[in-house]
């Protein structure tokens, strides 16, 4: 007899800094855009206070992962340097790691230089790369 619940029938998990995340049920990822030109919420979350307020709200509403993006992927968005992307991310990552040390952090970037900084300096748990590592 086959199980009725076949969509999540396999057992998957992620090991994030030694914490095993069970993916047998869906997880909520809160999106934090720290760009001034995001098509969704551009410019709303650029200060430490704004970042922490939004992060706390998303966690309270059920997010178990916070995905931080500092480069807008909207059509026609400004092309920024890796250094500018890193600068934007550092403000958010400093604040989140300090005030929410146990939250799972994902960084949305397609640049290896930015991903390396995020992993080395902030021990981010996930790199969310729209290019699957093929951009550079």
Predicted regions and their residues:
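Short, well-ordered coil/turn segments that N-cap beta-strands
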Residues: 24-28, 63-64, 101-103, 123-125
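Conserved, mostly hydrophobic/aromatic
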Residues: 32, 58, 62, 108, ...
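Alpha-helix-loop-beta-strand connector modules within alpha/beta enzyme cores
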Residues: 78-107, 112-117
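Glycine-rich, proline-tolerant flexible connector loops at the mouths of alpha/beta enzymes
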Residues: 38-40, 65-91
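Catalytic beta/alpha-barrel core
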Residues: 102-110, 125-136
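Active-site mouth loops of central-metabolism enzymes
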Residues: 34-53, 78-79, 105-106
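Glycine-enriched alpha-helix->loop->beta-strand junction motifs that scaffold or abut catalytic
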Residues: 116-126
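N-terminal amphipathic alpha-helix/helix-capping segment at the start of soluble metabolic enzymes
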Residues: 1-33
